[in-house]
Amino acid sequence: MEKDLSREAYYYHLPEENIAQKPADKRDHSKLMVLNTSTGKVEHKIFNNVLEYINPGDMLIVNNTKVFPARLTGHKESGGKVEVFLLELPTYIRPGVSESIALIKSSRKPKVGSTLTINEALSCRVTEQLAGGKARLQLHYDKDVDVTEILAGIGEIPLPPYIKREEGTTPEDVTRYQTVYANVPGAVAAPTAGLHFTEELLQSLRENGIQFGEVTLHVGYGTFAPVRAENIVEHNIHEEFVSVGQETVDKIIATRKAGGKIWAVGTTTVRSLEFAAAQHGGQIAATEGWCALYIYPGFKFQVIDNLITNFHLPDSSLMFLVSALCRREKLLECYQMAIKEDYRFFSYGDAMAVISGE
Protein backbone atom coordinates (compact mmCIF):
# COMPACT_ATOMS: atom_id res chain seq x y z
CA MET A 1 0.00 0.00 0.00
CA GLU A 2 2.89 2.35 0.80
CA LYS A 3 4.19 2.06 -2.76
CA ASP A 4 0.70 2.93 -4.05
CA LEU A 5 1.18 6.37 -2.47
CA SER A 6 4.47 7.09 -4.24
CA ARG A 7 4.13 9.26 -7.35
CA GLU A 8 7.02 7.59 -9.16
CA ALA A 9 5.23 4.23 -8.85
CA TYR A 10 2.75 5.47 -11.47
CA TYR A 11 5.32 6.37 -14.08
CA TYR A 12 5.45 4.54 -17.40
CA HIS A 13 7.26 5.32 -20.64
CA LEU A 14 4.93 6.20 -23.51
CA PRO A 15 6.32 6.43 -27.06
CA GLU A 16 5.30 9.68 -28.79
CA GLU A 17 3.59 7.75 -31.58
CA ASN A 18 1.05 6.38 -29.08
CA ILE A 19 -0.24 9.87 -28.23
CA ALA A 20 -3.36 10.38 -30.36
CA GLN A 21 -3.13 13.64 -32.32
CA LYS A 22 -6.56 13.36 -33.93
CA PRO A 23 -9.75 11.40 -33.29
CA ALA A 24 -10.51 7.95 -34.67
CA ASP A 25 -12.27 7.90 -38.06
CA LYS A 26 -15.51 6.97 -36.28
CA ARG A 27 -16.22 7.64 -32.61
CA ASP A 28 -17.25 4.11 -31.69
CA HIS A 29 -14.56 2.40 -33.80
CA SER A 30 -11.76 3.19 -31.36
CA LYS A 31 -10.20 0.27 -29.50
CA LEU A 32 -11.59 -0.88 -26.15
CA MET A 33 -9.58 -2.75 -23.54
CA VAL A 34 -11.80 -4.55 -21.04
CA LEU A 35 -10.35 -5.39 -17.62
CA ASN A 36 -12.31 -7.62 -15.26
CA THR A 37 -10.98 -6.74 -11.81
CA SER A 38 -12.40 -9.91 -10.23
CA THR A 39 -10.65 -12.36 -12.57
CA GLY A 40 -7.82 -10.20 -13.92
CA LYS A 41 -8.90 -11.14 -17.45
CA VAL A 42 -8.12 -8.59 -20.19
CA GLU A 43 -9.94 -8.50 -23.54
CA HIS A 44 -9.34 -6.41 -26.64
CA LYS A 45 -12.43 -5.12 -28.42
CA ILE A 46 -13.80 -2.30 -30.56
CA PHE A 47 -15.66 0.35 -28.55
CA ASN A 48 -19.14 -0.46 -29.85
CA ASN A 49 -18.65 -3.96 -28.37
CA VAL A 50 -19.30 -2.30 -25.00
CA LEU A 51 -22.89 -3.48 -25.58
CA GLU A 52 -21.68 -6.97 -24.60
CA TYR A 53 -20.79 -5.84 -21.08
CA ILE A 54 -23.53 -3.42 -20.01
CA ASN A 55 -26.51 -5.54 -18.98
CA PRO A 56 -30.24 -4.76 -19.10
CA GLY A 57 -31.11 -3.01 -15.84
CA ASP A 58 -27.66 -1.43 -15.51
CA MET A 59 -27.32 2.36 -15.52
CA LEU A 60 -24.87 4.43 -17.56
CA ILE A 61 -24.08 7.91 -16.22
CA VAL A 62 -22.41 10.57 -18.37
CA ASN A 63 -21.01 14.05 -17.85
CA ASN A 64 -23.02 16.48 -20.00
CA THR A 65 -20.60 19.42 -19.76
CA LYS A 66 -19.81 21.22 -23.01
CA VAL A 67 -16.43 22.70 -23.95
CA PHE A 68 -16.77 26.38 -24.78
CA PRO A 69 -14.50 28.30 -27.22
CA ALA A 70 -12.15 29.53 -24.51
CA ARG A 71 -9.06 30.42 -26.55
CA LEU A 72 -8.91 33.99 -27.89
CA THR A 73 -6.18 35.87 -29.75
CA GLY A 74 -5.80 39.63 -30.00
CA HIS A 75 -3.39 42.45 -29.27
CA LYS A 76 -2.30 44.67 -26.39
CA GLU A 77 -2.39 48.46 -26.36
CA SER A 78 1.24 48.36 -27.53
CA GLY A 79 0.21 46.31 -30.56
CA GLY A 80 1.92 43.14 -29.33
CA LYS A 81 0.18 39.82 -29.80
CA VAL A 82 -1.69 38.31 -26.86
CA GLU A 83 -3.44 35.00 -26.28
CA VAL A 84 -6.26 34.84 -23.74
CA PHE A 85 -7.36 31.46 -22.41
CA LEU A 86 -10.60 31.84 -20.45
CA LEU A 87 -10.63 29.37 -17.55
CA GLU A 88 -14.33 29.71 -16.88
CA LEU A 89 -17.45 30.73 -18.75
CA PRO A 90 -17.83 34.52 -18.38
CA THR A 91 -20.16 35.63 -15.58
CA TYR A 92 -22.77 38.25 -16.50
CA ILE A 93 -22.27 41.59 -14.70
CA ARG A 94 -24.55 43.91 -16.67
CA PRO A 95 -25.53 44.38 -20.34
CA GLY A 96 -22.32 44.47 -22.38
CA VAL A 97 -20.06 43.46 -19.48
CA SER A 98 -19.02 40.03 -18.14
CA GLU A 99 -16.18 38.79 -15.96
CA SER A 100 -13.86 35.79 -16.17
CA ILE A 101 -10.52 34.39 -14.99
CA ALA A 102 -7.94 33.77 -17.72
CA LEU A 103 -4.41 32.68 -18.46
CA ILE A 104 -2.71 35.36 -20.56
CA LYS A 105 0.18 34.55 -22.87
CA SER A 106 2.21 37.47 -24.21
CA SER A 107 5.79 38.73 -24.35
CA ARG A 108 5.16 40.88 -21.26
CA LYS A 109 2.47 40.52 -18.61
CA PRO A 110 -0.30 43.09 -19.23
CA LYS A 111 -0.70 45.61 -16.41
CA VAL A 112 -3.85 46.03 -14.33
CA GLY A 113 -6.08 48.53 -16.11
CA SER A 114 -4.74 47.73 -19.58
CA THR A 115 -7.04 46.67 -22.40
CA LEU A 116 -6.62 43.61 -24.61
CA THR A 117 -8.44 43.95 -27.91
CA ILE A 118 -9.67 40.67 -29.37
CA ASN A 119 -11.53 42.25 -32.30
CA GLU A 120 -14.06 45.01 -32.94
CA ALA A 121 -16.72 43.01 -31.07
CA LEU A 122 -14.81 42.14 -27.89
CA SER A 123 -12.19 43.68 -25.62
CA CYS A 124 -10.89 42.57 -22.21
CA ARG A 125 -9.73 44.86 -19.41
CA VAL A 126 -7.30 43.44 -16.85
CA THR A 127 -8.79 44.17 -13.41
CA GLU A 128 -6.55 42.03 -11.17
CA GLN A 129 -3.40 39.93 -11.38
CA LEU A 130 -3.77 36.52 -9.73
CA ALA A 131 -1.37 33.75 -8.75
CA GLY A 132 -0.16 31.20 -11.28
CA GLY A 133 -0.08 33.57 -14.24
CA LYS A 134 -3.83 34.11 -14.08
CA ALA A 135 -5.69 37.40 -14.30
CA ARG A 136 -9.23 38.59 -13.67
CA LEU A 137 -10.73 40.15 -16.78
CA GLN A 138 -13.73 42.29 -17.54
CA LEU A 139 -15.10 41.52 -20.99
CA HIS A 140 -16.71 44.40 -22.91
CA TYR A 141 -18.99 44.00 -25.93
CA ASP A 142 -22.22 45.33 -27.46
CA LYS A 143 -24.93 45.39 -24.78
CA ASP A 144 -27.47 43.89 -27.19
CA VAL A 145 -25.34 40.78 -27.76
CA ASP A 146 -24.80 37.68 -25.59
CA VAL A 147 -21.11 37.11 -24.87
CA THR A 148 -21.47 33.38 -25.60
CA GLU A 149 -22.51 34.26 -29.16
CA ILE A 150 -19.35 36.34 -29.55
CA LEU A 151 -17.15 33.54 -28.20
CA ALA A 152 -18.80 31.06 -30.57
CA GLY A 153 -17.88 33.34 -33.47
CA ILE A 154 -14.28 34.22 -32.60
CA GLY A 155 -13.06 31.77 -29.95
CA GLU A 156 -11.31 28.46 -30.54
CA ILE A 157 -11.94 25.15 -28.81
CA PRO A 158 -8.87 24.67 -26.57
CA LEU A 159 -7.05 21.41 -27.21
CA PRO A 160 -4.87 19.70 -24.56
CA PRO A 161 -1.16 20.66 -24.52
CA TYR A 162 -0.07 17.17 -25.69
CA ILE A 163 -1.98 17.53 -28.98
CA LYS A 164 0.72 19.17 -31.08
CA ARG A 165 -0.28 19.69 -34.70
CA GLU A 166 1.08 22.17 -37.21
CA GLU A 167 -2.44 23.09 -38.28
CA GLY A 168 -3.59 23.72 -34.69
CA THR A 169 -7.32 23.51 -34.02
CA THR A 170 -9.34 22.39 -37.05
CA PRO A 171 -13.07 22.53 -37.90
CA GLU A 172 -13.21 18.80 -37.11
CA ASP A 173 -12.24 19.52 -33.49
CA VAL A 174 -15.33 21.70 -33.03
CA THR A 175 -17.49 18.57 -33.19
CA ARG A 176 -15.11 15.74 -32.31
CA TYR A 177 -13.66 17.33 -29.13
CA GLN A 178 -17.21 17.36 -27.79
CA THR A 179 -19.47 14.51 -26.67
CA VAL A 180 -22.68 14.00 -28.66
CA TYR A 181 -24.70 14.66 -25.48
CA ALA A 182 -22.84 17.81 -24.35
CA ASN A 183 -25.43 20.46 -23.46
CA VAL A 184 -24.18 22.54 -20.50
CA PRO A 185 -21.39 24.95 -21.56
CA GLY A 186 -18.62 25.56 -19.03
CA ALA A 187 -15.68 23.19 -19.59
CA VAL A 188 -12.26 24.02 -21.01
CA ALA A 189 -11.47 20.33 -21.61
CA ALA A 190 -13.73 17.52 -22.77
CA PRO A 191 -14.74 14.58 -20.56
CA THR A 192 -12.95 12.38 -23.07
CA ALA A 193 -14.30 8.93 -22.18
CA GLY A 194 -17.61 10.13 -23.60
CA LEU A 195 -16.13 10.97 -27.00
CA HIS A 196 -16.49 7.32 -28.07
CA PHE A 197 -20.29 7.28 -27.92
CA THR A 198 -22.44 7.89 -31.00
CA GLU A 199 -26.18 8.62 -31.07
CA GLU A 200 -26.68 5.17 -32.62
CA LEU A 201 -24.74 3.41 -29.86
CA LEU A 202 -26.67 5.28 -27.17
CA GLN A 203 -29.94 4.28 -28.84
CA SER A 204 -28.85 0.63 -28.96
CA LEU A 205 -28.08 0.77 -25.24
CA ARG A 206 -31.53 2.22 -24.52
CA GLU A 207 -33.17 -0.50 -26.59
CA ASN A 208 -31.23 -3.06 -24.53
CA GLY A 209 -32.87 -1.77 -21.35
CA ILE A 210 -30.01 0.37 -20.08
CA GLN A 211 -30.96 3.32 -17.87
CA PHE A 212 -29.28 6.70 -18.45
CA GLY A 213 -28.37 9.53 -16.13
CA GLU A 214 -26.45 12.79 -16.42
CA VAL A 215 -24.23 14.81 -14.13
CA THR A 216 -22.41 18.06 -14.83
CA LEU A 217 -18.77 18.62 -13.96
CA HIS A 218 -17.13 21.51 -15.78
CA VAL A 219 -13.65 20.16 -16.51
CA GLY A 220 -11.11 22.84 -15.62
CA TYR A 221 -7.56 23.55 -16.74
CA GLY A 222 -6.38 22.01 -13.48
CA THR A 223 -7.04 18.59 -14.99
CA PHE A 224 -3.70 19.04 -16.82
CA ALA A 225 -1.78 20.15 -13.71
CA PRO A 226 1.14 17.80 -12.96
CA VAL A 227 1.45 16.08 -9.60
CA ARG A 228 4.66 17.33 -7.99
CA ALA A 229 4.40 15.82 -4.49
CA GLU A 230 6.45 12.64 -4.06
CA ASN A 231 3.76 11.28 -1.75
CA ILE A 232 0.52 11.53 -3.74
CA VAL A 233 -1.51 12.15 -0.57
CA GLU A 234 0.15 15.59 -0.34
CA HIS A 235 -1.07 16.67 -3.80
CA ASN A 236 -3.58 19.53 -3.84
CA ILE A 237 -6.33 18.47 -6.23
CA HIS A 238 -8.04 21.14 -8.33
CA GLU A 239 -11.62 22.28 -7.69
CA GLU A 240 -14.34 21.91 -10.32
CA PHE A 241 -18.04 22.79 -10.34
CA VAL A 242 -20.35 19.78 -9.98
CA SER A 243 -24.10 19.32 -10.25
CA VAL A 244 -25.90 16.03 -9.62
CA GLY A 245 -29.66 16.34 -10.04
CA GLN A 246 -32.52 14.57 -8.28
CA GLU A 247 -33.63 12.67 -11.40
CA THR A 248 -30.22 11.00 -11.71
CA VAL A 249 -30.16 10.25 -7.97
CA ASP A 250 -33.62 8.62 -8.10
CA LYS A 251 -32.54 6.43 -11.04
CA ILE A 252 -29.36 5.35 -9.22
CA ILE A 253 -31.35 4.33 -6.13
CA ALA A 254 -33.88 2.43 -8.27
CA THR A 255 -31.11 0.69 -10.24
CA ARG A 256 -29.37 -0.35 -7.03
CA LYS A 257 -32.60 -1.74 -5.54
CA ALA A 258 -33.21 -3.78 -8.70
CA GLY A 259 -29.69 -5.23 -8.60
CA GLY A 260 -28.28 -3.27 -11.54
CA LYS A 261 -24.72 -1.97 -11.84
CA ILE A 262 -23.77 1.71 -12.00
CA TRP A 263 -21.43 2.53 -14.91
CA ALA A 264 -19.58 5.85 -14.84
CA VAL A 265 -18.46 7.25 -18.18
CA GLY A 266 -15.20 9.00 -17.32
CA THR A 267 -13.29 9.98 -14.21
CA THR A 268 -15.23 13.26 -14.00
CA THR A 269 -18.47 11.30 -13.62
CA VAL A 270 -16.85 9.20 -10.88
CA ARG A 271 -15.77 12.31 -8.98
CA SER A 272 -19.22 13.88 -9.37
CA LEU A 273 -21.10 10.86 -8.03
CA GLU A 274 -18.70 10.04 -5.22
CA PHE A 275 -18.61 13.72 -4.22
CA ALA A 276 -22.42 13.76 -4.06
CA ALA A 277 -22.31 10.73 -1.75
CA ALA A 278 -19.46 12.08 0.38
CA GLN A 279 -21.46 15.26 1.01
CA HIS A 280 -24.29 13.18 2.49
CA GLY A 281 -22.63 10.59 4.71
CA GLY A 282 -21.99 8.08 1.94
CA GLN A 283 -25.55 8.13 0.57
CA ILE A 284 -26.08 9.50 -2.94
CA ALA A 285 -28.17 12.70 -2.92
CA ALA A 286 -28.73 15.71 -5.17
CA THR A 287 -25.71 18.01 -4.86
CA GLU A 288 -24.37 21.21 -6.36
CA GLY A 289 -21.08 22.85 -5.47
CA TRP A 290 -17.32 22.97 -5.88
CA CYS A 291 -15.72 19.54 -5.83
CA ALA A 292 -12.16 18.91 -4.65
CA LEU A 293 -12.66 15.20 -4.02
CA TYR A 294 -9.35 13.38 -4.42
CA ILE A 295 -9.54 9.67 -5.21
CA TYR A 296 -6.49 7.41 -4.91
CA PRO A 297 -5.83 3.81 -3.73
CA GLY A 298 -7.60 3.10 -0.46
CA PHE A 299 -10.68 5.12 -1.42
CA LYS A 300 -14.00 3.39 -0.68
CA PHE A 301 -16.43 3.82 -3.57
CA GLN A 302 -20.03 4.37 -2.50
CA VAL A 303 -21.80 4.76 -5.85
CA ILE A 304 -20.06 3.40 -8.93
CA ASP A 305 -19.35 -0.22 -9.87
CA ASN A 306 -17.76 0.04 -13.31
CA LEU A 307 -15.82 2.67 -15.23
CA ILE A 308 -15.30 3.56 -18.87
CA THR A 309 -12.22 5.75 -19.26
CA ASN A 310 -9.33 6.63 -21.56
CA PHE A 311 -5.61 5.94 -21.08
CA HIS A 312 -4.12 8.64 -18.87
CA LEU A 313 -0.84 10.52 -18.49
CA PRO A 314 1.94 8.94 -16.40
CA ASP A 315 1.84 9.71 -12.65
CA SER A 316 -1.35 11.77 -13.01
CA SER A 317 -4.22 12.09 -10.53
CA LEU A 318 -6.44 10.31 -13.08
CA MET A 319 -4.18 7.24 -12.92
CA PHE A 320 -4.49 7.33 -9.13
CA LEU A 321 -8.29 7.30 -9.44
CA VAL A 322 -8.37 4.32 -11.81
CA SER A 323 -5.87 2.49 -9.59
CA ALA A 324 -8.31 2.83 -6.70
CA LEU A 325 -10.65 0.60 -8.73
CA CYS A 326 -8.27 -1.95 -10.20
CA ARG A 327 -4.90 -1.92 -8.35
CA ARG A 328 -1.92 0.06 -9.52
CA GLU A 329 0.15 -2.96 -10.63
CA LYS A 330 -2.68 -4.28 -12.78
CA LEU A 331 -3.28 -0.87 -14.35
CA LEU A 332 0.39 -0.49 -15.29
CA GLU A 333 0.35 -4.02 -16.70
CA CYS A 334 -2.66 -3.07 -18.83
CA TYR A 335 -0.95 0.12 -20.00
CA GLN A 336 2.14 -1.83 -21.11
CA MET A 337 -0.14 -4.23 -22.94
CA ALA A 338 -1.90 -1.27 -24.59
CA ILE A 339 1.41 0.18 -25.80
CA LYS A 340 2.42 -3.20 -27.23
CA GLU A 341 -0.97 -3.51 -29.00
CA ASP A 342 -0.72 0.01 -30.49
CA TYR A 343 -3.53 1.57 -28.48
CA ARG A 344 -3.81 5.34 -28.79
CA PHE A 345 -3.47 7.31 -25.55
CA PHE A 346 -4.97 10.43 -23.94
CA SER A 347 -7.87 12.64 -25.04
CA TYR A 348 -8.34 11.49 -28.65
CA GLY A 349 -7.16 7.99 -27.81
CA ASP A 350 -8.74 4.61 -27.17
CA ALA A 351 -10.83 3.46 -24.23
CA MET A 352 -10.66 1.11 -21.28
CA ALA A 353 -13.53 -0.49 -19.37
CA VAL A 354 -12.83 -1.44 -15.76
CA ILE A 355 -15.54 -3.84 -14.60
CA SER A 356 -16.02 -5.59 -11.28
CA GLY A 357 -17.37 -8.77 -12.86
CA GLU A 358 -19.08 -9.90 -9.67
UniProtKB/Swiss-Prot annotation:
Pathway: tRNA modification; tRNA-queuosine biosynthesis. InterPro entries: QueA, QueA_dom1, QueA_dom2, QueA_sf. The keyword Transferase applies. It comes from the Bacteria. GO terms for molecular function: S-adenosylmethionine:tRNA ribosyltransferase-isomerase activity. Its EC number is 2.4.99.17. GO terms for cellular component: cytoplasm. It catalyses: 7-aminomethyl-7-carbaguanosine(34) in tRNA + S-adenosyl-L-methionine = epoxyqueuosine(34) in tRNA + adenine + L-methionine + 2 H(+). GO terms for biological process: queuosine biosynthetic process; tRNA wobble guanine modification. Signal peptide: none annotated. Keywords: Cytoplasm, Queuosine biosynthesis, S-adenosyl-L-methionine, Transferase. Its main location: cytoplasm. Monomer. Transfers and isomerizes the ribose moiety from AdoMet to the 7-aminomethyl group of 7-deazaguanine (preQ1-tRNA) to give epoxyqueuosine (oQ-tRNA). Belongs to the QueA family. PANTHER family: S-ADENOSYLMETHIONINE:TRNA RIBOSYLTRANSFERASE-ISOMERASE (PTHR30307:SF0). This is S-adenosylmethionine:tRNA ribosyltransferase-isomerase. It comes from Desulfotalea psychrophila (strain LSv54 / DSM 12343).
